[in-house]
Amino acid sequence: MAQPRIPAARGAAASLQAQNGAASASGSPYTNGPVHNTLMSPQVSSSQGYDSQPPGSYPRPMPAKTLNPFSAQSNYGGSQGSGQTLNSPLVTSGPVLPSLHSGPVPRMPLPTSQNPAATPMPSGSFLPGANPPPPLNWQYNYPSTGPQTNHFPHVAPPTLPGNPNLTADHQYVSSGDPALQTSFKKPGSALPLQNPPLPPTFQPGAPPGPPPAGGPPPSRGPAPQKTPPRAAPPPSFNSAVNQEGITSNANNGSTAAHNTYDEIEGGGFLATPQLVNQNPKTSRSVGSAYPSLPPGYQNSAPPVAGMPPPSLSYPSGPQAFTQTPLGANHLTASMSGLSLHPEGLRVVNLLQERNMLPSTPLQPPVPNLLEDIQKLNCNPELFRCTLTSVPQTQALLNKAKLPLGLLLHPFKDLVQLPVVTSSTIVRCRSCRTYINPFVNFLDQRRWKCNLCYRVNDVPEEFMYNPLTRVYGEPHKRPEVQNATIEFMAPSEYMLRPPQPPVYLFVFDVSHNAIETGYLNSVCQSLLDNLDLLPGNTRTKIGFITFDSTIHFYSLQEGLSQPQMLIVSDIDDVFIPMPENLLVNLNESKELVQDLLKTLPQMFTKTLETQSALGPALQAAFKLISPTGGRMSVFQTQLPTLGVGALKPREEPNQRSSAKEIHLTPSTDFYKKLALDCSGQQAAVDLFLLSGQYSDLASLGCISRYSAGSVYYYPSYHHQHNPVQVQKLQKELHRYLTRKIGFEAVMRIRCTKGLSIHTFHGNFFVRSTDLLSLPNVNPDAGYAVQMSVEESLTDTQLVSFQSALLYTSSKGERRIRVHTLCLPVVSTLNEVFLGADVQAISGLLANMAVDRSVTASLSDARDALVNAVIDSLSAYRSSVLSGQQPGLMVPFSLRLFPLFVLALLKQKSFQTGTSIRLDERIFAMCQVKSQPLVHLMLTTHPSLYRVDNLSDEGALNINDRTIPQPPILQLSVEKLSRDGAFLMDAGSLLMLWVGRNCSQNFLSQVLGVQNYASIPQTMTDLPELDTPESARIAAFISWLREQRPFFPVLYVIREESLMKAAFLQSLVEDRTESALSYYEFLLHIQQQVNK
């Protein structure tokens, strides 16, 4: 039965420019999604890569009215308003097609081959039709860009068993934070300390002797001839001429001049064998400081709330490396291991087994690899794939109806991180992959890349292992023993001297802003954390305030007090005395402190109600553009003056109407300014503190496209809303003190045959696959969609590698590399067995946000539901033998319907008029920028009973005992009036206390005598000297650790105003506009059985 075409999809081609930004003067469109590879398509036409065919019919209709009891709240048609045109594109030095963020367009299927001639995608689903396979992306159909241009015969990657015995003294290099010291003793000496910290850098000397005696090393071909060095034009930070692979391979270690970060990351220093003296005694010292025991950083960090405990499947130390080819017998043995995991082979009837939620945090599936390979794999907290068994062909992926993609948390805080300071960074000469645990050493002199299969020479320096102080063991080097590693980049990876840490604060000081009292909190937090700002002696700081005019503050050393400089012409902003506005923090610290102490009182009597945010941002950009850095902007109302002025668009009675909802920006000013900031290595973080509509859909662009962050505090007031004050202070502390990387770029590579075509997150896509990140922080997550471009029948393993090149706050250029290895499978059953339901749900959420913005909220909701229907239909028709009653799902997808239902009830996609527009936009911002673990906790909260906490099964972390109560289903059935239940919703904690809760809990934890004495607005637990109070305080403190947003706590009585929010989060129960979990399962079953 054909489904009518969704109105939002009509006119897709006509509104292309409106949905993807604007075209530059050269005809290159600013887009939010995939772009052409300029290597393959140097000529760009105005219509290139876009599929303007109308969407086809969809064979399985999903009427919105069947999902929502109130059809008037769920039937949305029509398209969104158009965007604006960018008038001043970024300067480029070649035919580049920049792409911004992840571009929303009216269709949102799963990734697939980008064939322009393919059948158009049905608009009501993420998933393809049956025959022929249509293109599966939520974007227009660009030709996909494979990461490699050189194809080589495949040799299976090696197996990596064993564990070396390290006996020498070794030392760590810190990961950017102040070094901690310890030493590891030789055998026979004292035992090492428990949980040893990291010592300072150690530079090993030359090898103790000549290379081991034996036959001559394998002969190598003649070294390529060197070419004359190229002249280096002036740096252009928003230029990305050279694509991946277009770099001279003739350097052979010589220093080359580079003019773009794209070239530096994609083709920088070529680690090839050099003409060196073969006598190590007379040659220069090789090697450098390495971690003494390439540490098991994956397992050393204390468990994070909401994440499963670290699995023993991930490395905890250096692993011995026996290079034996992985043959068919190895894979057969690996596949036979499936019988050891009967749970994975289970088929579940969800209508009979509804309680499938585990009582402990859900663990990601372990890839079906040999143990020797898996123990070297990347930690899934950092890098994970939606399918841990990669389909061999695109046809098999289409048949599974599951998305293929990656979710990354590349800059996550790590307790221990192996850092390599060698002058030689070994990379593939063809695809520029960094050497990693999954390459294959053909012999001691040659290694085969696991992404493009090119055979590379092993540099002479790489033959010496400073860990073991043995020559001739390249496979035991730290680079080949750790899936996550950081390199200290040599000067060849720099376009200019590393930029200093620059922090510019921009404050709204209008009457409305002063009334909220936020300036007192922010200035006090800055005073408290001024010495903790990441940086060094070069750190610079500056301040701008604005209302209807713009105020600068001269902090020149030698002044007795700060001087205010006022610019009243907001139509032509200029910078007065620019050399005195951004000052060295150490040299002008007293003036900075004086300003922060007096600033809140300077505007207490202001009557100015206008807000010139746009001109203030222009001024801030001009001030920070020579160096780059971070702008922190605080805004409390809708901008009303100058460029970027906005008008109210919210209709309270039509907040979820497809025709009236305003999820798209009303102006392109903030997007254009963000592009300019990105080009000058400046990021903008937005703090919105407003009780009124402020058009976050427009304002948020300034952070989204400059790799910044958005913080939102609705109804902030220093007296009327103390919870928001606490939240702001806690989040400012983390924001000001967390690790930061400047002028960063990130590239994701994958094995030949796979293709990345869409990115999600806060960044600017500078070239085909290079993400520009002026700032990178530990709380940022990213996602990508992929397709199988070429058949993987000739390989048994595929690998993915992300490389993040950044400048630390200490002025060091570093490269953090993560490598993930996964098996390739040829059957549909194996694909389903390896499905990662959390990663799938997270990727679909990102895709649904784009669909909401570019089509309609109704389209996004229907597509989420259809994703479940299509995948379970494929499993039923292609894997199950015979028709079985009920809703049969593979064990790996047992929580898929539950997570999708939770997404439908999340603020981003919830129907009804109770969600304010800015709140919905902020929820969508979180979906697009949060790491997966935090996104899933926001989507599907964790519920615990806490009135009977005990030490049984507790965690012991740093002499703290952390109770671990079981996780309960999100249903009122699990509540009881004689208990107390804590819900962890990521950025919110709600403690629901039953009317008949025990007197012991009331007195020993809440500090009240009876239930009626619980305050209506209780937001903190008293610190009582009782075991019960200590247990729950430790548990809540543990939950709050390492969260990007501080979760405030509300204590809820049965009569509390917050009770509605608590019940709304019980996603398995029916609400006025959404089905219960059981009703949703019945609906899914009805659609699957059609």
From Swiss-Prot:
Keyword Transport in annotation: yes
CC per GO annotation: COPII vesicle coat; cytosol; endoplasmic reticulum membrane
Gene Ontology biological process terms from the UniProt entry: cholesterol homeostasis; COPII-coated vesicle cargo loading; endoplasmic reticulum to Golgi vesicle-mediated transport; intracellular protein transport; positive regulation of protein secretion; regulation of cholesterol transport
Keyword annotations of the record: Cytoplasm, Cytoplasmic vesicle, Endoplasmic reticulum, ER-Golgi transport, Membrane, Metal-binding, Protein transport, Transport, Zinc
Binding site for Zn(2+): 428, 431, 449, 452
Zinc finger-like: annotated segments: 428-452
Comp. bias (Polar residues): 29-55, 138-151, 162-184, 237-258, 274-286, 313-325
Region (Disordered) residue spans: 1-260, 272-325
Coiled-coil stretches noted in the UniProt entry, renumbered to this chain: none
A Pfam short name: Sec23_BS
Gelsolin-like repeats: 963-1036
InterPro entries: ADF-H/Gelsolin-like_dom_sf (IPR029006), Gelsolin-like_dom (IPR007123), Gelsolin-like_dom_sf (IPR036180), Sec23/24_helical_dom (IPR006900), Sec23/24_helical_dom_sf (IPR036175), Sec23/24_trunk_dom (IPR006896), Sec23_24_beta_S (IPR012990), SEC23_SEC24_subfamily (IPR050550)
Family: Belongs to the SEC23/SEC24 family. SEC24 subfamily.
Job description of the protein: Component of the coat protein complex II (COPII) which promotes the formation of transport vesicles from the endoplasmic reticulum (ER). The coat has two main functions, the physical deformation of the endoplasmic reticulum membrane into vesicles and the selection of cargo molecules for their transport to the Golgi complex. Plays a central role in cargo selection within the COPII complex and together with SEC24B may have a different specificity compared to SEC24C and SEC24D. May package preferentially cargos with cytoplasmic DxE or LxxLE motifs and may also recognize conformational epitopes.
Assembly information from the UniProt record: COPII is composed of at least five proteins: the Sec23/24 complex, the Sec13/31 complex and Sar1. Interacts with TMED2. Interacts (as part of the Sec23/24 complex) with SEC22B; recruits SEC22B into COPII-coated vesicles for its transport from the endoplasmic reticulum to the Golgi. Interacts with STING1; promoting STING1 translocation to COPII vesicles in a STEEP1-dependent manner. Interacts with TMEM39A. Interacts with SACM1L; this interaction is reduced in the absence of TMEM39A.
Name the record gives this protein: Protein transport protein Sec24A
Organism: Mus musculus
